Amino acid sequence: MRKSGILMHISSLPSKYGIGKMGKSAYDFVDFLVSAGVKCWQILPLSPTSYGDSPYQSFSVYAGNPYFIDFETLKREGLIKKSDYEDIKWQDNDHQVNYSIIYNNCFKVLRQAYKTYKRDISKRYKTFVEKNSSWLDDYALFMALKFKNNGKPWYEWDKKLAMRDSNALKKASEELEKETEFFKFIQYKFFRQWSNLKKYANDKGVEIIGDMPIYVSSILIVSSGIKGTGPYLLSSNQ
């Protein structure tokens, strides 16, 4: 059976905050598709972007992009105040995404949300972490290490960490426990918002056609989300 569809990535939705988000504009777009009789919404990979900011080159094939988390939703949940994100200059113009601005500010807002949330970690959050531990633990630690190393690629880190030495990873996990929890929290909020948006679309009769990152880069090698993955399993020049 033939169906009509439109390609519109989350990043291209209208937003005052530099990049499209899973908030009102996303739900409005679903309503537009319904009114136009469009049955399929095609999107690009939802994974966090890496150097170059292509949705097809990511830190993980499992994780979601923090940039798409809607601030207004976090505000309604009581996790942040409007002043936490409204007073930030998110873009240079209305037609292009400035990823440097977003990178430098998005995590500040999300840290404020986490600071509020961690006072009362919910059962739902704990269930999410346990259910996704097969990839989430490695991903969160990788991101914590990447931030600690000022965004440098893994091959410029301490050699033992880069080669996934078990003792070095154990020590890093203990030292960066709070930071890894922050990145787990980000994924929890992403998938909560994404699940709600997807359900809304599906309930309205709109199917979502997804995609996945296909370019394995050197920064993906130790953060693919597969237990035991290390640079000795993949070659970055093949």
Positions of PLM-derived features:
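Catalytic cores of eukaryotic secretory-pathway lumenal/extracellular enzymes that build
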Residues: 231-238
